[in-house]
Amino acid sequence: MTLKRNGNDAPLRIVRLDKELPLPRRAHPTDAGIDLYTAQDVTIAPGCRELVGTGIAIALPVGTVGLVHPRSGLALKKGLSIVNAPGTIDADYRGEIKVCLINLDPEEPIELARGERIAQLLVQEVSLCDVEEVNSVEELGVTVRGESGYGSTGV
């Protein structure tokens, strides 16, 4: 199958810091997320969080950002999520990718085995715009929404 790609076609360069772990990959060719694996066995007590290494370092293409999202199956079946979902990986970061996991189950600990899929990485284009200060809200421009914020479109 030939996939049509949009925008930046530069590859995601990955180094496995732990060669025994699988290379991160998509479960299906058209999946947005690339599965990330835990580099160690870990037990997360109810309501607790744990910073878990994935055993990889990456070089994202310039003009992209890596967003680390929870896996929906683990969220549903075990109550596992990511504290700062989505986690943000900047294109110039070269350290090990780590995921701050949290056990949202109020009673049961979550046991994760080394090599288990724990999160998914999405690579998205990002606008690297400059910051320009203006002197008043009026200089930001008028919109239909204006200052209507939280709950303004209904519950």
Curated annotation (Swiss-Prot):
Keywords: Hydrolase, Magnesium, Metal-binding, Nucleotide metabolism. This enzyme is involved in nucleotide metabolism: it produces dUMP, the immediate precursor of thymidine nucleotides and it decreases the intracellular concentration of dUTP so that uracil cannot be incorporated into DNA. Substrate binds at residues 71-73, 84, 88-90, 98. This is Deoxyuridine 5'-triphosphate nucleotidohydrolase. Belongs to the dUTPase family. Gene3D superfamilies: 2.70.40.10. GO terms for molecular function: dUTP diphosphatase activity; magnesium ion binding. Its EC number is 3.6.1.23. Pathway: Pyrimidine metabolism; dUMP biosynthesis; dUMP from dCTP (dUTP route): step 2/2. SUPFAM superfamilies: dUTPase-like. Pfam families: dUTPase. Its cofactor is Mg(2+). The gene is dut. GO terms for biological process: dUMP biosynthetic process; dUTP catabolic process. It catalyses: dUTP + H2O = dUMP + diphosphate + H(+).
